[in-house]
Amino acid sequence: MSRISRRAYADMFGPTVGDRVRLADTALWVEVEKDFTVYGEEVKFGGGKVIRDGMGQGQMLAAQAMDLVLTNALIIDHWGIVKADIGVKHGRIAAIGKAGNPDVQPGVTVPVGPGTEVIAAEGKIVTAGGIDSHIHFICPQQVEEALTSGVTTFIGGGTGPATGTNATTCTPGPWYLARMLQAADSLPINIGLLGKGNASRPEALREQIAAGAVGLKLHEDWGSTPAAIDCCLSVAEEMDIQVAIHTDTLNESGCIEDTLAAIGDRTIHTFHTEGAGGGHAPDIIRAAGQANVLPSSTNPTLPYTVNTVDEHLDMLMVCHHLDPSIAEDVAFAESRIRRETIAAEDILHDMGAFAMTSSDSQAMGRVGEVVLRTWQVAHQMKVRRGPLAPDSSYSDNFRVKRYIAKYTLNPALTHGIAHEVGSVEVGKLADLVLWSPAFFAVKPALVIKGGMIVTAPMGDINGSIPTPQPVHYRPMFGALGAARHATRMTFLPQAAMDRGLAQELGLQSLIGVAHGCRRVRKADMVHNTLQPVIEVDSQTYQVRADGELLVCEPASELPLAQRYFLF
């Protein structure tokens, strides 16, 4: 039997079982747990390579073969870190295993035929497209920025740069919901809209859900009173949609105890649960320990650095329509920004108490930095806290699975769309992101949306090859024309489907039905199930989880930062 060195094999076909890969310039390493390919029968495209007629490519018709195969990919997902070929059919993941020609090769589960396109993923990492569950739809250009960061799904609300949208993630009322659903139909990203949940009577909430709101948002700027919370959750239970909440920073209508009492044992998604983005001062962070609370962070506080506190005051004044000449407005802003709770947030993420990350796009958050900042937190916690059990000093597989779930599967579960998106699993939309390991979490090599490349770095269009400078991200064919409709999905509640809303509005995109989110609990948050008793000292703002003081020095230097953005 012929043999080659591990190094030569990895250079040719990518890493295999036992090999380690460093994630960009972080302190994080992953180890390949399983290899689905067959040694000696690997497929690779190119001159003199395997995927040729009668060799790695068979004679089957399109119905029996894949539309697209990603060869020799290193998949990083909540369920594993494995080497495999990925097959895509009709825009969905159809197989994960061994690609090739079953007529002449053993173990083939991903058949390649004359109708099959190939993307070479040797030496590349493949992850699921990210889900940003805290989007202010302030401008449509957010979509391009998000796609080039590896995010392929938006959940949020808004109508453009209106004052209400600048502050709150709500698309209020049936008319605006209809117009935003029609606008979203032309955007090459999956979208679900949140209606305004602040009402003390149910009728106006029911009509928003019937008009297409996949969830409702309670926001203090509209009045997150106990009555509004109870009414909103009652309608959500009745109509099977999720509720997201930004609680009462000023504690005017009640403190955290009153909010938790109004919520009861009903499931709710708490936004920026640390509190700098808004919420009961100083102890909204306590909510992260509740069994029915699905807690997320927004990215301005992630990770805690020497600059975090200083930038927050101005952000807050702008986004929430505050006046720096009014002392009460300044006091309101300052009450939300606490070094101690911001520092504790990183640690609670590492412990698995905070389950999700998101952006808060253009409203105290950066839409293109959800993926990047999630991994900066993971790095910082590795440096500060060491390996995370059951990891060893050799690899960080469990920590990596915990963190990737925060912006993929867990927000999908939270909003009832995990049957369509959120992981690299058979049957789901082929929303896939390819990364060169050196650029992981910073600059994708390709972004695939519903089976088509939607954006990619591309060189000089008049070049003789695709790679000459200047290279920058450009929209690809998956983002154009009717291909957008065949590769993107609009999420609607069952109530909207029952009335034929998609047909009524003339929507041409794929339609996904959000459902089952009322049954989701903290225990269902993959790799992020911890429910500690969290205490906050009202004078010092020190945070304890199950009695342990959570203290973390701010970072003065981070990976995934300046060295990647010089040009």
Swiss-Prot record:
Binding site for Ni(2+) 1: H134, H136, K217, D360
UniProt entry tagged with the keyword Metal-binding: yes
SUPFAM superfamilies according to UniProt: Composite domain of metallo-dependent hydrolases, Metallo-dependent hydrolases
Biological process, per Gene Ontology: urea catabolic process
Catalytic activity: urea + 2 H2O + H(+) = hydrogencarbonate + 2 NH4(+)
Binding-site residues for Ni(2+) 2, renumbered to this chain: K217, H246, H272
One Pfam family hit: Urease_alpha
Biological pathway: Nitrogen metabolism; urea degradation; CO(2) and NH(3) from urea (urease route): step 1/1
Cofactor: Ni cation
Enzyme Commission code: 3.5.1.5
Keywords: Cytoplasm, Hydrolase, Metal-binding, Nickel
Active site: residue positions: H320 (proton donor)
Binding site for substrate: H219
InterPro entries noted in UniProt: Amidohydro-rel, Metal-dep_hydrolase_composite, Metal_Hydrolase, Urease_alpha_N_dom, Urease_alpha_subunit, Urease_AS, Urease_asu, Urease_asu_c
Processing and modification events after translation: Carboxylation allows a single lysine to coordinate two nickel ions.
Cofactor: how and how many bound: Binds 2 nickel ions per subunit.
Compartments (UniProt record): Cytoplasm
Urease domain location: 129-567
Oligomeric form and interacting partners: Heterotrimer of UreA (gamma), UreB (beta) and UreC (alpha) subunits. Three heterotrimers associate to form the active enzyme.
Protein name according to UniProt: Urease subunit alpha
